[in-house]
């Protein structure tokens, strides 16, 4: 009986919130240009355009405004309980990020689902959509996120099979299938299955926001990224008023090293996100833009973007995008410029997501080791070990592995600083090999510095230029067109006496940073080398 009262209370609070949100929303500009979506329902004809706008927002992960818009629909037509599907889909959060619904979000979603079951949608198809999303929330508290993701994927696969002519069912099936992709699976099997569904849909619906969006995610891997350029260059024009739609193309631009495109689209995304008070999205876009500018040698612009982002708080969103970007941007600014003393002085900030704290301790430790302060590096290494232990205890395997990659790299540079070159290379190589087996998370444009690139720099310091060049060039396969990689490759080739290859890499460095600040020592060296030939 108590459970029934609780469910009723939650449901009632949802309906009240829906009504309030609808009244508040009456004076808002509801979304703008978001792409074309067709999702027939049995709801009142007057709310159908608003419902489809909410679905378009859902496809572009504009969750806060989509939630308000679905609430607006339900307030205008209380019989339109298929909105429970949309509401519950929003509360699962980004299905590619792996974080899933919060406990509070799961309770709200279940209340909406229960309300839809008490007042069922008028058609079987709509009821099936509600039950498909309900599969994720079933026994929510007693299942790990991976089990929920798999249940969701199977439910939407069944929905798509039952309604083969329902293109929205096919598109959501592809999304949730892509959401089962493991970072450890470098066959990218789930992505390949999603692509097989989405590419025909893209030909059929070139202005559909979800199709372009999910294609980008499904091509977001080193060997696949080139195939994602068509969708990447299309998506921002499909839904230019959605902050995430403006950011998403840069997932592909980063993978292929197209930095100018990444800067442009992320600046637009950050501006639109701040206008919409979507702070996690604004920080996320800013981190990608900072990363891209640093590759172009635009250190001043990177710093300005970071400082602009820091003028705004991250809000109370459970998304890790804010704390990750807040920790990553200053670490990138120091590490990409080789400012080891600056890196060592970065200030750690406590976070509910401990892996974001690890970014700062990693940068501090590398900076301290490379500027000769071994004692400080060892203290920060202890913090990394402690964070790694916490993540393992929480069974957060992916991020525990990422922190272990950082810990091994730090141990390698500490060994290097102590004069134990062989041990340093051994540890740094272990870090690079582990990183290669663990695909980067979508929250980041890239690790603070690629581990294999760090290995190349260590070998170069040890006067092993041939070995260093081998590692730099291997790193380019996964992280192309990076400033520090070209600089390291050029210096390694120069030290080997390979003048032709050195000149080629120095020329790439100069071309890459032709619109940069021009004050990095690596660039001065490159210009001098080219001038003397």
Which sequence ranges carry the predicted segments?
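Residue at a conserved register position within TPR or TPR-like alpha-solenoid repeats
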Residues: 57, 91, 135, 177, ...
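TPR/TPR-like (Sel1-like) alpha-helical repeat modules
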Residues: 81, 88, 92, 103-118, ...
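Amphipathic alpha-helical repeat scaffolds of TPR domains
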Residues: 45-53, 79-94, 121-141, 165-183, ...
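Solenoid-like repeat scaffolds
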Residues: 75-76, 160-162, 202-204, 233-241, ...
